[in-house]
Amino acid sequence: MKVNLVDFRNSIKLTQKEMAEKVGTTLSYYSKIELGLRNPSYNFMEKFKAKFVDANMDEIFFS
C-alpha cells in the first residue's frame, strides 16, 4: 500500500502544525512539502527519521 506524508501524518493523528513542531520546521514549510510545492530538505528528512524511527522513508517520500 502506498503511504505518503499526509497518510502517515493522519495515521498518527497529528495536525500539520503538530507535525511541523515535531520535526522542528515551520507550518508553512511543512504544508508546502505535503502539497508537493517544496521538496523536503536533507535536514528535514534527518529530523523526520529521528522522530519517527519506524517510518518507512522510501514509502513515504519516494513512492
Say what each PLM segment does.
Residues 1-12, 22, 58-59:
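A short, Lys/Arg-rich alpha-helix, primarily the initiator
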Residues 5, 16, 27, 42-45:
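Helix-turn-helix DNA-binding elements, focusing on the entry/boundary residues of the two helices
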Residues 6, 25, 52-53:
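Short, functionally important structural connectors and interaction interfaces within domains
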Residues 13-31:
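Short alpha-helical DNA-recognition segment
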Residues 43-59:
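DNA major-groove recognition helix of helix-turn-helix/homeodomain DNA-binding modules
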Residues 63:
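Short acidic/histidine-centered micro-motifs embedded in hydrophobic/aromatic stretches
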